[in-house]
Amino acid sequence: MKAVLITVALAVFLIFCGAFLKNNDSDWISLFDGKSLDNWKVGANASTFRVEDGMIVVNGATAHLFYEGDVMNHDFKNFEFKADVMTFPGANSGIYFHSVYQENGWPAKGYEVQVNNSHTDWRRTGSLYGVDDIKEVYVKDNEWFTEYIKVVGKKVVIKINDKIVVDYTEPDSVQQKVNIGGRRISDGTFALQGHDPKSKIYFKNIMVKPLPD
């Protein structure tokens, strides 16, 4: 009888764990429908961004594509974010978070997570640009990789293919290495960067998981 009770208890536990994991996975929300740039907004040089074969293709003059959709009213504070990315030789791009739409120029608000495996800028993919930069190249051009960002409170974790490359906590008194203005943990939306006409990058499976404040 005791063995039966243990078996039943174990089965219930496994079912509970399975349900928990399933719910956890289902918390991911897609920000890109794979067909259009609906819910995204770009100002100057809009032709830098287009959709092909379920991907956002970035190639053209300097521009930024901001998420302006209904998920969290495009205002994220604590979250997990991930996207599948492919770079081509010499390409430079970035993923901004805690940003806000602006018509042109480099985003004045938010942090940038670097996408760059072989551009002349030494700050490589996964760098928290100008704040916690990395020189190592963890992934190759012409291959898909997953870039992951998690923000909770003042803490930022960045992973490349599940490898932690940045684990940064913003101090109460921020002393940045470079003049990057509005780079502060706050809240806001995401943006994809079109860096220059020579850079070509693909993005797909752009997902977010909002986390409690």
Residue locations for each model-derived region?
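Positively charged n-region of N-terminal signal peptides that target proteins for export
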Residues: 1-5
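Bacterial N-terminal signal peptides
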Residues: 7-16
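Carbohydrate-interacting regions of secretory-pathway proteins
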Residues: 17-213
